[in-house]
């Protein structure tokens, strides 16, 4: 029955009594059947293996399918693409033999049914599955996605979706590009995800305007593409300086118009400049200023040929973080041997970094730091009394 009623835009006959028990493929069966909306729930589809594109662009279709035995269906990709009226309970479907669900509910704008019990353990493709499925907001945290390799665009435009996903085993996924693009409600922890096999994170959180979760522990060492990763993710402000970005070839527009603070941008520049990064990488941070990361930024440009677009140097205004900084005075600066610190404290923890982000001093002090053994140059001091933290720059001459 492949393509049987394809493009029959006015077809709307009652075919509910058909004996389809020997049919093995229903691919494209009702594609572009604009007005079709007839009962099909009595069909015996137990021998069907391919339902891909079955109701694609069947804009009016919204009939129960809960009686269907889909246990032999292997291909479900594009099944309900732009079936914009469809919102039926298919929670009991046995999809355990399906391997492909890419774009299954793309544009199914009213679909919002509980499919939490689905066994998707054989599926390798969930790409664009809920693209523009703007009503979908169901808990699918217990899905076994351990064999999925492709999750590009999975929740792109799923504007209502904000459910936990931290239990997902994504260790085989290679492509997360556009995964949460324009998923404007999504703000759930993803810190447990093993992304060590991912190579593409381009546009992953593009316009994900609510997302602001700690993903500092992610192993991104195999990622080569981070273009537009947080573009216009205008609440995202997390420390990702610990990321190993040595494989990344393109960060163009990566942080543009995000909510990245000066301090988070600084520490990212400092730590990344210490890595064996790729040459001539474009890093976009439009709207974001730097201060203490100035030397590290210049090192990335001069040594590695990076092209960095940001809002420039700004050490003049206090950031939100600065409101909790220590009230101290450091002198002399520059200094050749010892730097003294005055302020209302009893003891300070001090960590000193060189311009490449390498830690050169880590100790507790009472009133001074011995820098006599350091090479000449600019150093960054992080000082903490246990409650407040401040960052200062000194020059060793």
Regions found by a protein language model. Give the residues of each.
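Negatively charged
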Residues: 2-317
